[in-house]
């Protein structure tokens, strides 16, 4: 069974989307505590803060996405954005690298860490 690679930008966007749904779920839980206004307000505020946090994450990844390197994937011939030394295609999840020293090596996200020496 092969390893499923995923693009870093898509991972962060998925995290932000999950924050939206988690925030709405937490705020909805506050409805069940209508008789205790403090608990209800706390749940709704925590849910609201999770939705605001997702907005911040979406803004951050949008700004980061404008600074990334755009390349053409050799497998699907579609443009994709690459963060770091190794990443995966946004469309076909093909492992990609722009570092000549890593060509032909097994895909590993540890190559993106500053402490890793090739």
From Swiss-Prot:
The keyword Transmembrane applies. The keyword Phosphoprotein does not apply. It comes from the Bacteria. InterPro entries: UPF0295 (IPR020912). One of its GO terms (cellular component) is plasma membrane. Pfam families: DUF2614. Keywords: Cell membrane, Membrane, Transmembrane, Transmembrane helix. The chain crosses the membrane at residues 12-32, 43-63. It is found in: Cell membrane. It is a multi-pass membrane protein. This is UPF0295 protein BCAH187_A0594. It comes from Bacillus cereus (strain AH187).
């Amino acid at each position: 069974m092969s390893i499923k690679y995923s693009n870093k930008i898509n991972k962060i966007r998925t995290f932000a989307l999950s924050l939206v749904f988690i925030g709405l779920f937490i705020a909805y839980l506050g409805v069940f505590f209508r008789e205790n206004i403090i608990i209800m307000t706390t749940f709704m505020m925590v849910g609201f803060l999770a939705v605001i946090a997702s907005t911040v994450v979406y803004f951050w990844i949008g700004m980061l996405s404008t600074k990334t390197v755009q390349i053409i994937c050799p497998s699907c011939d579609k443009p994709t954005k690459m963060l770091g030394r190794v990443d995966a295609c946004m469309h076909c999840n093909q492992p990609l690298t722009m570092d000549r020293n890593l060509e032909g090596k097994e895909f590993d996200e540890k190559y993106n860490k500053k402490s890793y020496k090739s």
